[in-house]
Amino acid sequence: MEQNEMLSGMPRRERAVMYKRDHNCCQAVLLAFAPELDLPQEKLLAMGACFGCGMGCMEETCGALCGAQIAQGLLKFDNRRMNPQASQLRAEFEQRCGATKCKDLKGVDSDRGVLCSCEDCVRHAVEALEYLL
């Protein structure tokens, strides 16, 4: 059985976790929504390439959240501003994960430790977007 066939029977959130093995968090979320986005895998990988270790590799906004917001725009954009929807997705992700910045989620410069693993951030980003779709 080919990998894509195997993954197609899995819940989207678990597909994203599987994609995380070989890709960054943003790419993993985008690939999980690939069938609905109707874009070549190479394009999705390119779109998410600069979001590893948080936005711009600076441990800022979590790449998984960025991927979910890119997917949200691709799925729902209708030539109107999407600020309310983007805000809802951010809030839903933060509720599930405890923060939105990569360095906060990973416990960098904090005594709290890891709030949410990368795998769980990817899983929760997919769940949050599915909830809002």
Regions found by a protein language model. Give the residues of each.
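Polybasic, low-complexity association/targeting segments
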Residues: M1-M18
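C-terminal binding/interaction regions
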Residues: Q3-M6, N83, S87-L133
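Short cysteine clusters
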Residues: C25, C62, C102
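Domain-length accessory/inserted modules outside core catalytic folds
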Residues: M6, M18-K20, L39, L44, ...
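Glycine/serine-rich anion-binding loops at beta->alpha junctions
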Residues: F51-A71
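Phosphate-handling active-site elements
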Residues: L37-A46, L74-S87
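Acidic-glycine-rich active-site phosphate/pyrophosphate-binding loop
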Residues: E2-E5, L30-A49, Q95-K103
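Buried hydrophobic packing segments
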Residues: V29-F33, L65-L75, A125, L129
